[in-house]
């Protein structure tokens, strides 16, 4: 679902307006700012040319897939809860105010082993910040 707000005198040009946004690669045409996944959700807080900021919420006893990205690096800051982060073959336990860098091409995963939601601020950097820039190695939700 989407909501488009524009002046009344322009309402006959809705299709054209969306096509113009698409031509400009405006992510608002492609992604809603709140996205739900089997493990929880994320909210896109800010998107610029070479960086993006998200708020991730990992539900209790859930984890994201073991994955890597070809085109982006990520920096995670725990703002609520405790995270178990896999980075390559090492596991890091991060509590509130702790952070970790995930360079591109690095296998990684976030897991919430707690009984309350885990909240992380994610800063992505790179030349291509696309949701489909993901190579999954393990996924308990059977996604490719």
Where are the language model's segments positioned?
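Left-handed beta-helix
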Residues: 2-77, 82-100, 108-109, 113, ...
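Glycine-rich GHKL/ HATPase_c ATP-binding element in histidine kinases
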Residues: 118
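C-terminal structural segments of small proteins and small subunits
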Residues: 121-129
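Conserved double-stranded beta-helix
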Residues: 135, 140-144
């Amino acid at each position: 679902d989407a909501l488009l707000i524009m002046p009344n005198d322009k309402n006959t040009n809705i299709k054209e307006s969306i096509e113009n946004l698409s031509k400009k690669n405006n992510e608002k045409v492609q992604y809603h700012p709140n996205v739900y996944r089997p493990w929880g959700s994320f909210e896109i807080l800010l998107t610029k040319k070479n960086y993006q900021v998200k708020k991730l919420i990992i539900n209790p006893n859930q984890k994201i897939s073991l994955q890597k990205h070809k085109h982006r690096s990520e920096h995670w800051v725990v703002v609520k809860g405790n995270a178990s982060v896999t980075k390559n073959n090492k596991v890091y336990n991060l509590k509130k105010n702790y952070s970790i860098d995930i360079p591109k091409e690095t296998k990684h995963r976030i897991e919430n082993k707690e009984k309350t939601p885990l909240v992380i601020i994610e800063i992505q950097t790179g030349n291509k910040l696309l949701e489909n820039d993901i190579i999954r190695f393990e996924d308990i939700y059977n996604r490719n």
